[in-house]
Amino acid sequence: EGYHLFVDGGSSNVGKVGTYRILPFLKYKGVKKIDCWVVSHTDEDHISGLREILSSGYPVEYLAVAEQMPRDENREELEALAEDAGTKVVWLRRGDIWHFGKATFTALHPGEPEAAFGGQSVDKYEESLVLFYQEDDFTGVFTGDIGAAQEEEILTWLQKTKTGAGVQKIDFYKAAHHGSRYSNSTGFLEALAPEIALVSCSRTNRYGHPSKEAVGHMQQAGSQVYYTMESGRLCVKKTDGQAVCRGYLEEKEQWWQ
């Protein structure tokens, strides 16, 4: 319905990714404004491009961030850039629902500090904003960099709420923490049962992402797994009731042929 939503956007190994990749892509697609830009957490590989976008004057109406996002230098810088750009910041916690036309974001994580973490301080990965996305019958989950403990916490909450009925047999799943073996647990994936799993990682990452264990869990859950390191930009659509994923590099190869 004319809304443009963006989740994260950064790189730890590509300089000026916002200026030379994200912004040109948005302009090429004719996107004149981002209505809501979601920030899962403040690692450079998730926000470096956003920082450049906000500094460029490109309009972003809302930033959606976790209410429990740690107050570090990156958060303070984002808040300052958003204020200078006239971008409104919305703080989300578990159970919050945000509507954009037919699309809705439901926050699955984090919850309140006392309930979620026993009042203890935690790192920014554990406090990543996790969202369930739904538009008509098209559904997906964005996970940030949460670990297996947070996945279990989300499942426990879903089992106690009506929201849980909709967060299963989803169309796409953005693999947690780039396919880390400390995330993407069997129980979490089997409960979500995603048709397609998307793994964002580079060939040269020093962490060995994605792990064989995580990919195995995705495949065991019945997911088709796609990787940005192999396919470049990934596009998921639903056609005739089935989710389909195409990669930019595959499309480019077919075009040349």
Language-model segments: residues:
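Non-globular, low-confidence helical/coil segments that flank catalytic cores
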Residues: 1-257
